[in-house]
């Protein structure tokens, strides 16, 4: 798609976000190999080096089947139910393979369920599966362990696509490094004294980039970043930093910004800024292993002190005025983090609020109640979320 302005590039990326399954299906129909990805631990660099599009799967509160809930059990993060609903419903049959990272209990249970269903019910047309189990301890044995796991993943990807990763790894590492750099620049457009993007739009751009090959996403992102100075400044709303469960759809952001008038200036979750925290130092499996081992601390895999320190630093960096935790039911890890996060930001005089055990669809009224006296002035008057 030829776009000539930052606004046009932004519109195109938002269109992709709202139609991700259809967009990726169209790429598959054009002959592109597509690998589904669950979780943030799967290196996009390896998928692209194998000649495929990395499509990070996501859910939505409107896409939940009774069958998926029965298969996985009710006491599991509903994101896994939604992803399984899509697989069982046949809407992801264009995938050439599916890599599930063991970054949460829900992801692990999803993998086991899919593997068993693929074995017992071949008519389901469930794609080939692979489980990626990376560790995040800051030790050399961890790096060596992770390097072996990435080597196995590279072999699996090559067998699925027919293209070994070795020849394309240097180019893919460079492309994904530029992608992360540009996405960090985009994320910064909601911060600073003159924000020009809402957190909602940043979330959508990041989500779109997780569904596009870099040869498609990079030109759009370059245009957006290069022309951002021409975008209109937003009125200043109360600056909210979001923690808790990763938001794989935009309804919480829309409620905070369009309904309550806040501005989401950052988040420590892996559908947002945390997904951009891996810095790969070379075009080899060892460098990838170290980068993904050391990426920003996720709730399910990092220590409480490291999470709290990361959150506090990002709250300071974004000049946030309140820390808001939104934690889904059956996603326990982020709730354990919150007391330490609350104490860390309180040392800087930043108030905090927590919404725990939330349904997959969080209501604006509940967000308003959680914020309490931390009311927001309208940030989106005359502008889209």
Q: What is the role of each PLM region?
A:
Residues 2-33, 147, 151-277:
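A charged, amphipathic alpha-helical module
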Residues 315, 319-325:
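Proline-aspartate-enriched helix->loop->beta-strand connector
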Residues 82-159:
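Acidic/His-rich segments in extracytoplasmic proteins that coordinate ligands and/or metal ions
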Residues 71-89, 298-313:
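Glycine-rich, highly charged phosphate/nucleotide-binding loops
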Residues 6-7, 338-385:
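Peripheral docking tails and interdomain loops at the edges
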Residues 39-59, 241-316:
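Redox- and metal-dependent alpha/beta enzyme cores, enriched for Fe-S-associated oxidoreductases
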Residues 15-24, 36-40, 44-45, 64-67, ...:
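Metallocofactor- and cofactor-centric catalytic cores in central/energy metabolism, strongly enriched
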